[in-house]
Every structure is written in structure tokens, then in C-alpha cells.
Amino acid sequence: MKNYRIESDSFGEIQIEEKFYWGAQTQRSLNNFKISKQKMPKILIRALAILKKCAAQVNYEFGDLEYKIATSIDKAIDRILAGEFEDNFPLVVWQTGSGTQTNMNMNEVIASIANEELTGKKGGKFPVHPNDHVNKGQSSNDSFPTAMHIATVLATKQQLIPALNNLLTYLQDKSKDWDKIIKIGRTHLQDATPLTLKQEFSGYITQIEYALERIEDALKKVYLLAQGGTAVGTGINSKIGFDIKFAQKVAEFTQQPFKTAPNKFESLAAHDALVEFSGTLNTIAVSLMKIANDIRLLGSGPRCGLGELHLPENEPGSSIMPGKVNPTQVEALTMVCTQVMGNHVTVTIAGSNGHLELNVFKPVIIYNILQSIELLSDSVNSFVTHCVKGLEPNIARINTLRDKSLMLVTVLNPHIGYDNAAKIAKEAHKYGITLKEAAKKLNFLSEEEFDKIVVPEKMIS
């Protein structure tokens, strides 16, 4: 049989299962928002705990919290950060648009843990009060966006940047010995002039290098924290200097260059910094979609496609066609890219709907951004491990397709003119003969002249 205790808020008393540490406002949220199962991301909960830890330290240093209260709050948060109370943060994303219930969830759990340590009994509001002590000098309106920024930075630095650097390393490693592999280029999915396989992959490498640069540029505004703006940006009930000292504490704890936002009205009412960052994630998804699709095309076959790359064979690909193997890692990555693009649409709409002094789409903004970061990170790591590491060029196929290409005729333009070169290409295509045979047949060049000019190795620089 379940045991319950009674907690209360301004709406009155409410029953809470005894084993949990949350209070009345968390329980009301559980009762009122039974909408799907997407919970607040763990890294956001961690960011909120870091926020409360730093706020309590500043409040103590400012003389606004007694030592006993501040210490008990700090110890409680350390236990949360150690993962001891993960099941005490059950709220879904689909709640109030300011994230108030999740902010109170954190306040209540911290106070409850602290009270248990001090009195032997969890819950309640004495001696540690969730609002008066844990939430002191704060509002959900500045705390939740601050946690959004902290979580975004931590997830990016811990997950996404390492994943992209890993992809960059393996693309560079794979292609470094491919400078002698001359293949036919393709534009409009039609044959074009030659290039090396290394040159082709250098485009992908640069896309990832630019992605990493874009992340660093977009993070500059995400480092700015709303804390200290309190309810509407004026800083009511927050001491002068709290915002600066708080940001310094967060920067010290996370080892990231957080600063207080210069204008708190903007940081509460708008989330342009996160919309911009989501745009960067969207651009990364665009880059990865292009890279993955190219590898998919170059690996098509095995006998009737381009077949210029051998992709690793990881699992059977068909329930009806024996022996079929598909580019499954490419398919997983490209599906992730479409999800990230869709997430950016959601973030864009949510970001554009900040009304007057507060944007109230905060949970859906951070949920989609953190999902995009996680999906990109995980899918890129999987793509590297199960695809990129095992890529190998099919030299024989590359040479065959290159030597058959009509577009090698381009190099003849300076010697016999565009129109005559076009006649050679059309003649070769019409009669199924080589360019050399067509050039000789049309009396434009001898075989010796043709061989001297049409040298793929001289067409790649």
C-alpha cells in the first residue's frame, strides 16, 4: 500500500506519495498536464540544479541566506547533480510556457532534501522554504531561460562538438591518401570534368570545419544569462550585482564563459539567441544531409549503380531480396537531419511568439534544441563508427567510369574550340565510340594529338 503525506500551496492541500521529494506545485502539474510522455531533458534539470547552487552561494555571500540554510541547499544540490534523485523530476514539456512548474519542481525537491537532512522528515517548508530560500532573488521568468542557455552550452560542448570533431578527423584521415585517385565529377547528376577523390571529400571536410565555426559564433549570445531580470526584466527582488556575481559563479562551475545579459528585458521576452543557435543546428543538418546523400550515391550498386565507394556492410537489407545490403547508416543520419530541420521550424515559430514582456514557449524551444543536439551527436557518432571508418574507394570502377566519360572533351576547348569539341562528344555518344575515335573520325585531331591533350591527371588542378 502506498503511503502519502500532505503538502500545501496557495490553492490548498494536496496528497503526495511519501517516497517522492517534490511538493504541491509539482504534484498539481502532474495532475493537470497529462500530455504525452516527453519529460524535461535531464541536461536541463542538471542546468537548473547548477543555477540553484550558484544562486544560493551568491545569496549567502550577500548575507541573504543563513549559513545553515545555504549549506543544506548546497548539499542537496550536490546529491541531485550526482544523479541521486532522477525520478523526482517527472514533469512533461507540455506545461506552462514559462517553465514555472519545472522551476518549482527543482525548488521543492531541493528544499525537501534539505529539510530531511535538517529535521529527519522530507517535504514541508521549514526550515528551508522552496520559494523564500531556494528561489530567493529569482523568478521562473529569468531562471528557466538561464537554465535553457546553460543546458544548450553544456550539451553542445559535451556532445555535439566532440561528435563533429570526430567526423572531421575521420574524413581527413580517410581522404589523405586519395589525392592520386582521379574520378569523374558530376554536376546536375550528369558527367562533368575530373577531380580527385580527395578533392571531392575536401568539400565535405570544409563543411564540417565551417559547422564548428558556426557553433562557436552562435554560442556567443547563448553565453549571456537572463538571471537577475526576475519577473519582467527590471530585477525586482534581486539585489544589485546579483546578476553579475551569479554569472561568474556559473562560469566558474561549468568552466564556460557565461556572462550576465546586458539587457534582461530582451532575454526574458525573446529567445533570438536560441533561434539563431537552432538555425546553426539546421545548417549543420543541411551539411550532413548533403554529405550523407553523396556517400549514398557514390556507394550505390553494387553492380548497377555508381559503385565508386565501398560502404561497410552492417546487416541484411531486405526481407525479400536475398543478399541485399543497404546504406542504413546514411538513412538513419538523413532521417535525423529531417527531424532537426523540423525542430528548427518549431523553434522559429515558438521564438517569434514572445508577447510583451515574456516569451511563453520556453519549454518547447529548449526541448527541440536539446533533441536536435542529441540526435545530431548520436547519429554522427554512429555514422563515423559504422560507415565513415570503413569507406574504401572502388578503384577499378572509378577508372572505368572516368575513362568512359564524354566530358573529358572539355579540355579540348582551347585547342579546337567549344563547337568542335561538342561535335566530338555528340559523335562519340551517338555511335558509342570513344572520344579519341570520334576526334579522328571528324578529322579534328590525330590519335597522338588527342593523347597529348586529353590527360585526366592534368585536368584536376
Curated annotation (Swiss-Prot):
PROSITE patterns: FUMARATE_LYASES. Keywords: Cytoplasm, Lyase, Tricarboxylic acid cycle. Homotetramer. Involved in the TCA cycle. Catalyzes the stereospecific interconversion of fumarate to L-malate. Its main location: cytoplasm. GO terms for biological process: fumarate metabolic process; malate metabolic process; tricarboxylic acid cycle. The keyword rRNA-binding does not apply. GO terms for molecular function: fumarate hydratase activity. It catalyses: (S)-malate = fumarate + H2O. HAMAP family: FumaraseC. GO terms for cellular component: cytoplasm. The record marks 331 as: Important for catalytic activity. There are 2 substrate-binding sites: the catalytic A site, and the non-catalytic B site that may play a role in the transfer of substrate or product between the active site and the solvent. Alternatively, the B site may bind allosteric effectors. Its EC number is 4.2.1.2. This is Fumarate hydratase class II. The gene is fumC. It is found in: Cytoplasm. Pathway: Carbohydrate metabolism; tricarboxylic acid cycle; (S)-malate from fumarate: step 1/1. It comes from Rickettsia prowazekii (strain Madrid E). Substrate binds at residues 98-100, 129-132, 139-141, 187, 319, 324-326. The active site is at 188 (proton donor/acceptor), 318. InterPro entries: Fum_hydII, Fumarase/histidase_N, Fumarase_C_C, Fumarate_lyase_CS, Fumarate_lyase_fam, Fumarate_lyase_N, L-Aspartase-like. Belongs to the class-II fumarase/aspartase family. Fumarase subfamily.
